[in-house]
């Protein structure tokens, strides 16, 4: 048994990923949420589900997110960029070999984000996942 949990980085995981890409992009531009932490309710669900079965978390990364709060509780973590549920399931069930590299780093904490230089990308001290991180198989 396993659980697949799909969360979005836009608005701290409170919105269904890809529910309306145009609205996602518009709202995240007009009303950017500077807090990259996941909502505490989402974190609690990840912890709860991790106790029940193997947990694969799929995060739609419209923007970077703080994933260190869930990283130790998941058996698999997949970062996506606006793909459909069908594509996610095909990848998980082995219909194709995924490949990909992060186009930005995933910071460990909001403190790291606040300490980085605005004009220098990927300069946090200890990111959870570095720029270019990714797996292929």
Give a label for each model feature:
Residues 1-137:
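C-terminal non-catalytic regions of proteins with extracellular/luminal or membrane-system context
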């Amino acid at each position: 048994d396993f659980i697949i949990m799909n969360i979005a980085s836009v608005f701290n995981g409170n919105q269904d990923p890809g529910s309306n890409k145009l609205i996602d992009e518009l709202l995240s531009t007009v009303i950017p949420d500077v807090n990259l932490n996941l909502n505490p309710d989402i974190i609690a669900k990840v912890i709860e589900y991790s106790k029940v079965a193997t947990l694969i978390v799929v995060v739609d990364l419209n923007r970077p997110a703080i994933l260190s709060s869930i990283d130790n509780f998941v058996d698999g973590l997949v970062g996506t960029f606006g793909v459909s549920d069908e594509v996610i399931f095909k990848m998980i069930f082995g219909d194709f070999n995924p490949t990909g590299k992060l186009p930005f780093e995933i910071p460990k904490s909001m403190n790291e984000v606040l300490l980085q230089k605005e004009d220098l990308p990927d300069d946090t001290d200890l990111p959870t996942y570095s720029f270019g991180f990714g797996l292929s198989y």
